[in-house]
Amino acid sequence: MTARPDFEKFIVIVTYGRSGSTLLQTALQTIPGAMIRGENNNLLYPLFRAWKRAHNTRYNQGQTPIPAHGPWYGADEIVPRRFGEELAGLFVREILKPTSQTRVLGFKEIRFHDAEPGEMPEFLDFIREFFPPCRLVFNTRRAADVARSSWWKDVETEKVMEMVEDLDRQYADYVAAHSDTSFLVRYDDYVKDRASLRALFDFLGEAYDEAAIEAAFARRLPH
């Protein structure tokens, strides 16, 4: 088993397109030793699905020893926990690529809602389980402002707003159920008042550097 690169904390920004998440990502980069990567096209989702299939195979078809002539031969020897840890380690090493100076690792993703209906909470549980110690930061924005973005120009405004409002409810429900490892922020709040991010930094157990935050917000984003 290949050892996973070491880090103190793992932070994942959970959101949707044009929520201001790149600004939040930049703000979290002010944490000393932080490497918060950008999007990866929801690459972790198929890894979660692979782990889920392994888990279901082991505990549905492999509950008892299976002989060599059995159709599920070997299913009883699958170790879902170890498989999940290997997938997580591979994702960290080959996708996030932390350096020896990385103390806080993570990424942001705007495609969590690509999960099958009702599956996102289970996907998030997988992340918390296999990337410890993990903190999920849910980033929201006013639905009407998201829908006005040209990024959503090929989708009807009402559909975008419905999606955002539904995701906001799902985010709030998840945070309420996992308040020890999850936190909710609103772009509309911190873009007007940087200090509103202090609560997030307190939750993460990190110092809030006002000057560094101001510099991060002043930096022009590439999109």
Describe these PLM feature segments.
Residues 1-93, 210-212, 216-223:
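PAPS-dependent sulfotransferase catalytic core
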